[in-house]
């Protein structure tokens, strides 16, 4: 078993997330919303804590018991960079919600601190293109979380150009083969980002439902704001309102029970999917195929460990209760399922291919 990734190596990607990305995010959140002195002081306190020991959740937190089961009793009080990177990163976002009063009494309860960023991305989207084939929609869904780099859904295969060439693994044929095996069944989609990524996810769901390639789509989103742009139920509704005729069809599909939105607490857990609870395991086990979207879900699917890139995908996902596909733009160091020649060619160009968002994969 490969070692769990921690963030204690200066200059490493995890270290940069903890010591550079998180402080920058606190500053952005502080500036994006007119929080009062108390909330600003709490944000400043969280910023000061990053170089020290992990603090506890706010007194009276309703989910304290849940986080204790997820490891807080073991990790609170220890330095941030000495605990598993996945755990520290997830817990940071939970603590950020405490700092802005998301769960507490007062005017900021339930106010998404990332809403200004999500709204700006959604407002910048071009109108959805009608009539795209499933393969084009699949690639649009894959590359959607590069929207911060200026990528947009484009019409037809020609518009995919550069994006397709960045694939380090492409088992899209295997994905369609699994989906078309037997009678149309349930497709589970574990969403990643809102806005530019969620919209093509929904357009793909609409196309598959309309073509009767699936009988229903179960869309898993986050129960509360998480990792800045991760999709919540509110983000689903916002996208449907921007999706034109497809949005109207999906709105009706939700009313009919053919599109089901679920926000399971484990979606925000700081743990790999190997530790999923039984009810979530039953959800995935009932599906013809589960599609895991994005970088974080990939890390949770295969395990946030120092795997050799040639480790077989099937080996590290063998625990999953049904067929599972990963659609992911590479934005962290974890990757498996590549052949030696591909790894050698990519490494020859430097290590940034793992983290720069310039490459992607489709694995089944």
Kindly give the residue locations of the regions a language model identified:
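Non-catalytic accessory regions outside enzyme or core folds
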Residues: 1-186, 363-364
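C-terminal functional extensions of proteins
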Residues: 6, 221-223, 229-364
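Conserved structured core elements
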Residues: 16, 86, 169, 198-202, ...
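Gly/Ser/Thr-rich loops at beta-strand to alpha-helix junctions
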Residues: 83-87, 190-199, 224-226, 295-300
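Catalytic-core regions built around general acid/base machinery
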Residues: 178, 204-211, 279, 283
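Residues at the starts of beta-strands that form the adenosine-phosphate
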Residues: 186, 214-218, 323
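Structural motif
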Residues: 186-188, 288-289
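Histidine-anchored nucleotide/phosphate-binding helix
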Residues: 196-218
């Amino acid at each position: 078993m490969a070692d769990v990734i921690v963030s204690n190596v200066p200059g490493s990607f995890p270290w940069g997330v903890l010591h550079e990305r998180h402080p920058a995010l606190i500053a952005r959140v502080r500036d994006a919303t007119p929080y009062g002195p108390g909330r600003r002081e709490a944000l400043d306190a969280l910023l000061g804590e990053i170089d020290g020991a992990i603090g506890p959740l706010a007194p009276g937190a309703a989910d304290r018991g849940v986080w204790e089961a997820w490891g807080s009793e073991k990790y609170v009080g220890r330095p941030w960079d000495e605990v598993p990177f996945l755990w520290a990163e997830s817990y940071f976002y939970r603590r950020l919600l405490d700092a802005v009063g998301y769960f507490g009494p007062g005017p900021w309860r339930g106010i998404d601190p990332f809403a200004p960023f999500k709204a700006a991305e959604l407002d910048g989207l071009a109108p959805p293109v009608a009539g795209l084939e499933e393969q084009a929609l699949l690639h649009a869904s894959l590359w959607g979380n590069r929207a911060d780099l200026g990528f947009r859904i484009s019409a037809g295969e020609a518009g995919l150009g550069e994006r397709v060439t960045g694939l380090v693994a492409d088992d899209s044929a295997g994905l369609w083969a699994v989906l078309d095996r037997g009678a149309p069944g349930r497709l589970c989609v574990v969403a990643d980002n809102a806005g530019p990524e969620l919209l093509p996810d929904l357009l793909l769901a609409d196309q598959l439902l309309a073509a009767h390639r699936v009988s229903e789509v179960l869309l898993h989103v986050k129960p509360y704001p998480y990792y800045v742009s991760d999709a919540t139920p509110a983000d689903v509704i916002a996208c449907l309102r921007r999706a034109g005729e497809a949005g109207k069809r999906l709105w009706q599909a939700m009313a009919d029970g053919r599109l089901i939105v679920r926000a399971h607490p484990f979606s925000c857990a700081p743990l790999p999917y190997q530790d999923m609870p039984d009810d979530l395991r039953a959800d995935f086990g009932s599906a013809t195929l589960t599609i895991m979207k994005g970088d974080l879900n990939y890390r949770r699917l295969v395990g946030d460990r120092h795997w050799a890139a040639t480790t077989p995908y099937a080996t590290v996902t063998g625990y999953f209760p049904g067929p599972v596909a990963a659609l992911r733009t590479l934005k962290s160091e974890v990757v498996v399922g590549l052949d030696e020649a591909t790894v050698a060619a990519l490494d020859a160009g430097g290590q940034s291919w793992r983290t720069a968002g310039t490459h992607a994969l489709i694995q089944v």
